[in-house]
Amino acid sequence: TVCEVLKEQNCLHQGETPYQIQLRTFEAMKRDMFPYLTDPDVFEVPVGSIEFVEAYLRKMYGIEKMVPLLVPIQLDIPEYLGRKDALVSSKSELREKASEWGAEEIFLKSASQLKCDYTGVYDIRKDTLPSDKEMYISEVLNIFSEWRVFVFNERIVGVKHYLGDPWVMPDKSVVYQMVREYTDCPAAYTLDVAVAADLYSGKSSTVVIEVHPFVS
């Protein structure tokens, strides 16, 4: 199995980095287990962690890395956001934007990599703010429940509860409207939505959190 191959490679090459082991493992799998991968007419879908998928795409197709989709421009409107958001490139710019919003806390994540170790809510008055060249920030929402919507060829194929109260469900018509309006999209993606208190009206509404490549 793939797990057995990975364990064997980890054991045989303990002095190498995980990335080097991944590349060596792919070569072994390609040669011994999946010789048909050399056939250009065959397309395989890697299943695993983001790190695994990125290493696979890099090795097999020369794709260096996947870029976060964040909130696509077609969905980045007040009707769907329920909050303010922005892209910033420094701590000073981050603080300026938060001050403009009148916010003492902001949600922050990387705008250049799918997974990072600093995603979270930060108090802008403290010195613990991370520093990065490309960061996505937004006002902090009061979220009651969060859901992941699976979309393939612009059609919803599944919905999964993600966080919060599973009995607080998103507005079906709003979710379908988001999918219809997000036309500049990949063939397959996931749409994270939440039921949250609107920061301005206080009313509960269905909002977009972010969009991910389908590997998420």
Describe the role of every protein-language-model region.
Residues 1-183:
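Active-site nucleotide/adenylate-binding loops and adjacent lid/helix of ATP-dependent enzymes
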Residues 150-151, 156-157, 186-216:
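Conserved metal-phosphate-binding beta-hairpin within the catalytic cores
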